[in-house]
Amino acid sequence: MDITIQHPWFKRALGPLIPSRLFDQFFGEGLLEYDLLPLFSSTISPYYRQSLFRSVLESGISEVRSDREKFTIMLDVKHFSPEDLSVKIIDDFVEIHGKHSERQDDHGYISREFHRRYRLPSNVDQSAITCSLSSDGMLTFSGPKVQANMDPSHSERPIPVSREEKPTSAPSS
């Protein structure tokens, strides 16, 4: 089997389309068979590479959605248990930190740690933010948005009028 060797300064024509495993969450877990195949394997087709985007889809997807009603962050944390995760709001940022100690897997021993920081939009109601972890390892952080045209410093807010039974003393002049 021929292995293509490329110099580090050589830029591939499809550079951003072909993901590098160096920076994904599977770094250090061993090479897979398709990692050793040349970019375009001529045995199948000159334009086909098996599992071209596999490492992108399985390396811990982070998705941020912001629409009119809510702001949502979805993060793949399948290698972490809820006890390994910490989610905090600091000023206008969401900080998500995950760390687990060294444990054995198929390739030896591994420990993982990540730290992600996202800016919260100014119109997110921080008091109503929720965070949940699904059974398949997706962490979902979401918060509703207040009206987009509302400026907290200049917004109109109704003040309730309450009735008291005793009279107010008149100010002396």
Curated annotation (Swiss-Prot):
sHSP domain mapped to chain residues: 52-162
Positions contributing to Zn(2+) 2 binding: H107
Pfam families tied to this protein: Crystallin, HSP20
MF (Gene Ontology): metal ion binding; structural constituent of eye lens; unfolded protein binding
Self-association and partners: Heteropolymer composed of three CRYAA and one CRYAB subunits. Inter-subunit bridging via zinc ions enhances stability, which is crucial as there is no protein turn over in the lens. Can also form homodimers and homotetramers (dimers of dimers) which serve as the building blocks of homooligomers. Within homooligomers, the zinc-binding motif is created from residues of 3 different molecules. His-100 and Glu-102 from one molecule are ligands of the zinc ion, and His-107 and His-154 residues from additional molecules complete the site with tetrahedral coordination geometry.
Stated role: Contributes to the transparency and refractive index of the lens. May act as a chaperone, preventing aggregation of various proteins under a wide range of stress conditions.
Name of the protein in its database record: Alpha-crystallin A chain
Organism: Rhea americana
Lineage, broadest ranks: Eukaryota, Metazoa, Chordata, Craniata, Vertebrata
